[in-house]
Amino acid sequence: MDVKSKHGHIKSNPEESLLFRNSVSKNIAQLSSINYADRNVQAALEQLSERKFKNEREARKQLPFEVFSDLIWTNGSIIKELSELSSQTLSVQSQLLKVKNSIDSYKNEWSKKTNDAQILLNSYETFCEEEALIEEKLKNIEIFEKNFVIMDDDLIHLTSSTDVDDRFYLILDKAQEIHDSSDSLFASLSGFVEYSSFEEIVKKMSRYIEAAFEKLFRCVQTELSDPQTAQTLEANSHLKKAFTKLFSEPTMVNKSINLIVQARQQILSTAYLTALTRGDFLSSSRPIELSAPDTVRFIGDLLAWIHQTIVNEKELVEALFAARKRQIQLNPFPPWDVPNVLEDQMNSLLDGSLYGICRPLSSRAQTSVLDLSDIVRLYNVIEILGFYREAFSKIVHDECIILRIIKTLEDFTYQRMKTVLDDELYTISNTNLSITDDLLPPDFVTTFLRNANSIFKIRGASLSVQGVDELPFKMLFMQLFDRILEICAAMTEDVRPPYKGIILMLNVLDSCTNYVGRYTFLNELFEYLQEKTTYYKNNLTTLLNNDYIAQAGLSDLLQKIADTTDDKQALKNYLHSWKWDQQIDKFSTFIRKTLSETIDNLQLLTSPIVTNQVLKETAISFVGAIETVDKALELSNLERRWPLSTEELLIAMNVDSMDTLSDIGQSDIDNLSVN
């Protein structure tokens, strides 16, 4: 069956046509059974209306035919398109096969090129490794040349007679770095391999460095030969830099210090002579020699000039070592450059510079001291020396030569004081000295104490308490007081009665303690004099007690009582046979004459305290002796009455009876009775 439409004729297979007709019939039947009142159908129809189909009966009748016609046309189009798609698919398969073949060909070519590229990459990596190795070797060579090689022109500049400039120091620093680096490297590897090249470098650098330092030393030596340069050394930056470098080399330190010392000794010696004889025109200071007649001022002026000189020299030494000190603080230092060693080097330089003026200073000061014979002025010199020694000790180290010189001068002046005093006392001891009736200290003692008091005042108001040694001061006056007491004791050997000599000694000691007791720094001497006073006071008490007992006629009686203490009958017989009438007469005479004379003599004691103590202790001893006799009489059933009662006797002895009676004890009686 042929179907004709607006699209033309399409031939088909009979079976296909049959199937097609059945399908179309079925669809038409379905279309005929559609409820056109259904909204969905209406919506569909409206859509058809939008396609310019009118929802009318006629149009609906024609719809199945039009749909069938469109379906046929559509299927035909689909079949055609499927046919074209099949053709295109075959074409695509052909193209894909070509692409696959191209890809396979490309893969083969890529694999070949990859292998070639890998070979090229391996070659490149090998080249890079070789290049890095070469660069490392070049870098090592550069480092070696930088750290272990010095150019020939630099070596010539380092060791030749050319001037020392900044380039010289740079080359010398490099040479030292090469030497130290090679030495360290050689030392660390010497146990494993032999590096003769490093050893040779170390030896060469050692020779170059030694030659460079010798050149630097000669240059400095030449410049210091000029007095003007040596005098302005602190302001010379070139020389300070040179010495800083020289101080860094252990073998050159002592040579450099000795060189500076020689130059500074000459400068200071010249300056000392100038200050001594001509003065300083810039500061309008007069020559020190003009003060020579006044020894104290002369020595003070000398020490003042030395003080200023020490300050200047200290500043110079610190300026010379300042850079070296900073180097040690910033960098690790070897054993020869520890701070203590550097401090010792500075002290050595300062001592050496000052040594040149210490000897003439000491000689001139000793000559001036020998011209003095006034002990007060001599001690003024000691105070000045002590003051400056204390001032110097704050500037210089403890073992500085100037401190030793000042201490030597101080000891020399002490010795001069001792010599002057010994001469005076020797002259006095060989003079015919006499004791005055008032038993006051001799004139030479008074003069000595006045001079000593002047010295004590100076010492008490001293500004150099830490500077002047106390030991020689105390020893000097301890010996002098001993010598004075010896002379006074020699004066009293022939004095009668003997207790007058003891009174004189107590008066001398009282004067001494009155002066010495004013000063706390003389406590040891004061205690020593107090011990002497106690000694003579006890001697006086014992002597008076024995004299009282002898003058009262009690000596034999007390001795017999002591001997017969255990034999009461013998004691009783002895006491019965004793001539008591004569005993009472002697006792009365003692009270009237001897006691009053002795008490009058005791009033010559200048110390009321000592007087009262002697009177009281003598009274206690004498009353104790009387009570010993009374007790013996009581044991023997005898009764004898003394001219005075105990209270009356104490009053006669010029002591407080009530106070003294309370102090009387049997132990004192026994001890003093035996004496």
UniProtKB/Swiss-Prot annotation:
UniProt key word Ribosomal protein: no
Signal peptide annotation: none
GO biological process: intra-Golgi vesicle-mediated transport; intracellular protein transport
Alphabetical list of InterPro entries matching this protein: COG6 (IPR010490), COG6_C (IPR048369), COG6_N (IPR048368)
Subcellular location as annotated: Cytoplasm; Nucleus; Golgi apparatus membrane
Main location class: cytoplasm
Lipid bilayer topology: Peripheral membrane protein
PANTHER family named among the record's database cross-references: COMPONENT OF OLIGOMERIC GOLGI COMPLEX 6, CONSERVED OLIGOMERIC GOLGI COMPLEX SUBUNIT 6
Protein name: Conserved oligomeric Golgi complex subunit 6
Source species taxonomy: Eukaryota, Fungi, Dikarya, Ascomycota, Taphrinomycotina
